[in-house]
Amino acid sequence: MVARAQPDRKQLPLVLLRLLCLLPTGLPVRSVDFTRGTDNITVRQGDTAILRCFVEDRSSKVAWLNRSGIIFAGEDKWSLDPRVELEKRSPLEYSLRIQKVDVYDEGSYTCSVQTQHHPKTSQVYLIVQVPPKISNISSDITVNEGSNVTLVCMANGRPEPVITWRHLTPTGKEFEGEEEYLEILGITREQSGKYECKAANEVASADVKQVRVTVNYPPTITESKSNEAATGRQALLRCEASAVPTPDFEWYRDDTRINSANGLEIKSTGSQSLLMVANVTEEHYGNYTCVAANKLGVTNASLYLYRPGTGRVDNGSVSLAVPLWLLAASLLCLLSKC
């Protein structure tokens, strides 16, 4: 807001005299005859605003006023604001320049001109536009599958920014008209990932921020690879599972947990676990069980190591035939890192 200076008491008679000469007695500035309608000037925050005013001759007495009071009376500056100056590119111009415009400068400004014939006023309404700026957005969150999720994105700007949400996937859906809040009911694992909030108006480029949503879900076996191998050769059984958090794996043979020993080695990395047999013997042939577990659940799959030529073609299958006590024990063991 353009501030107004207080005149020194010693100068008060002179100031009053000047104002009496400038403004007709008994005629308020805002009640004089209007020769022009109100002009609107739109300026972006931080730019310079030029409010134009012209007089008919050099003998005219001129003043600039706003809702706070007098800014300039003739050549005398009443405002304390250093951003405000007169713009006089010709003898008949009496324009007002406001640098680094801010929102509190918005409002009506009046150029009052006292000529030899009658007073005139010209009104200008300054509109300050503000680029969009996201002021608050939800933090990254982790939820369990099936939960309800509400994401919040708040933005400031003039005109008021339009907010849109978008799920950042190759086929990401754009949620139009959601305003500040994006609600996801019964979230699924496919809805995990980054969500982008965009705040836009016509003043400047949109402001964009992101929030990551992590969805926890229990393991699901995505691949279980059985294999054949001759005695004396190496063999490999592979088990993969999808889960968040990343699953832990265990291997069983005839209800007995397998450890990396006696020619057997287990390598688990991320969502994959490998059971490797260094030197296949007759006792290695048969059924193996891969168990994947995290804090939300446990699942298993049966895989086979068989002799070449037996005709068994089996890429493994999810099996529920494993005793429940084994699944429960596996989950407990995995969660306790036994």
UniProtKB/Swiss-Prot annotation:
Cross-referenced PROSITE patterns: IG_LIKE
InterPro entries linked to this entry: Ig-like_dom, Ig-like_dom_sf, Ig-like_fold, Ig_I-set, Ig_sub, Ig_sub2, IgLON_domain
Record's keyword terms, sorted: Cell adhesion, Cell membrane, Disulfide bond, Glycoprotein, GPI-anchor, Immunoglobulin domain, Lipoprotein, Membrane, Repeat, Signal
SUPFAM superfamilies: Immunoglobulin
GO CC entries: plasma membrane; side of membrane
Signal peptide, first to last residue: 1-28
Name the UniProt record assigns to this protein: Limbic system-associated membrane protein
Chain's role: Mediates selective neuronal growth and axon targeting. Probably serves as a recognition molecule for the formation of limbic connections.
Lipidation (GPI-anchor amidated asparagine): 315
Domain Ig-like C2-type intervals: 29-122, 132-214, 219-306
Subcellular localization: Cell membrane
GO BP annotations, alphabetical order: cell adhesion
Family indicated by similarity: Belongs to the immunoglobulin superfamily. IgLON family.
Residues modified by glycosylation: 40, 66, 136, 148, 279, 287, 300, 315
